[in-house]
């Protein structure tokens, strides 16, 4: 007796087997597809791991930007009066109103002071007036870092040309080395200053302060455009500086770690708010 009694039974069985084969084929394809997906996921995971490792290493490379402010000649004797500044009335730059009265500020030796106060109270206006007096003095070497960097930066020059005051190749090489330590690329060193970010401009001015060997620094929001990774380095540099610092800041860490005295700007003048021991 034949295995299959009729053609219809044979067709039905063949159809079932064909469906089973197609199902197995589809499962095999899906399995290969899943393996490919898993492989892609694992590859992506490894790539993210490598990126994470690189990111965790960033603070170490950022810490390496350290360089000193001033030199052995920047130290100011403890008893030397850096400034004894008096002003009856502080006017707005346009002369339309009085911001404060009876201002008095005395700084001696290596004192580092910070002026705080509300926006519009006249802090920057006062600091500019103080800088005008100190920058003219011959018995000290003062440098000023304004809140608006463009007041000092020559925007069409490259960072190297702006910082180069001698034209000697040796000095230009040193400037490039310092800029490299501040994470400037060779290309960025040749860009006009106007194309730089706020943080890059701040680094140029910080390097200018260092190269100048000044012993009095006048700083308006000195930590404002530096990254959180650079902040501790900048604060340490200013803390170790052997000269005097007159500054404005809203940065609590800077005030606590760097400044010896904190003055509040009021309509009645400068009020000593606290002395850090």
Regions found by a protein language model. Name each.
Residues 1, 75-277:
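ABC ATP-binding cassette signature C-motif
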Residues 1-96, 108:
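Coupling and communication elements adjacent to P-loop NTPase active sites across diverse families
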